[in-house]
A protein has these predicted regions:
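Short, Lys/Arg-enriched N-terminal segments with co-localized hydrophobic residues
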Residues: 1-2
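Glycine-rich phosphate-binding segment of PLP-dependent enzymes
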Residues: 28-92
Length: 193
């Protein structure tokens, strides 16, 4: 059969590359054992690909979306369409997809600065934020930080077992608390994720 010929050719190619027959056979055995996992991953990828393709069709992605713009950001049909596609794919109300948003810290800074105003307070009930957010918040002094704009910060550390300190959180909440940030990633801290 065609598949048997393909397998024989593959085995020969591996042998020519110096892969010993026992190693090759072991790899084939492991691949066979993982076949169901690989199939599951492939199905997830296929589902996600279809989700993206459906969103592209729904939002009428076309060659016009790839045309150059004036550079001022007005009437950029490509950007507007791309953001609608992202919102549909991720099931969100809206999306910002810009090359100017360079990293996760940048995205979080934009979110915090868009929601907090002078006199407001940001609460972190999971302890200290990721290192790069310290300057954004103003834990470490920085020009343009939330603290510089009169936004205070309070944190409640997790309990030694990694659970929320519910009593501490209740005490920390006050009339100034406008936003609570829960960071799952531990960053460089030794706490559990």
């Amino acid at each position: 059969s065609v598949m048997e010929q393909r397998d024989k050719i593959l085995e020969e190619y591996y042998a020519q590359m110096g892969i010993a027959k026992p190693v090759y056979d072991f790899c084939m055995k492991v691949e066979e054992e993982l076949k169901d996992r690989f199939l599951s991953i492939d199905k997830t990828a296929e589902c996600n690909q279809m989700k993206v393709l459906r969103a592209m069709q729904k939002n009428h992605l076309s060659e016009a979306c790839f045309a150059p713009t004036t550079g001022y950001g007005y009437n950029d049909i490509g950007r507007e369409t791309l953001e609608k596609i992202y919102a549909d794919v991720f099931g969100t109300e809206d999306a910002l997809v810009r090359p100017q948003i360079t990293c996760g810290t940048h995205a979080l800074a934009l979110a915090l600065m868009s929601q907090l105003r002078p006199g407001d307070e940001l609460l972190s009930p999971v302890g200290k934020p990721y290192d790069t957010l310290e300057e954004v918040i103003g834990i470490r002094p920085s020009n343009g930080s939330l603290a510089e704009y009169g936004i205070s910060y309070r944190q409640v550390d997790l309990l030694p077992d990694g659970e929320f300190d519910w009593d501490g959180i209740e005490k920390a909440l006050n009339e100034k608390t406008k936003l609570v940030t829960i960071q799952r990633s531990k960053g460089y801290a030794s706490r559990p994720t």
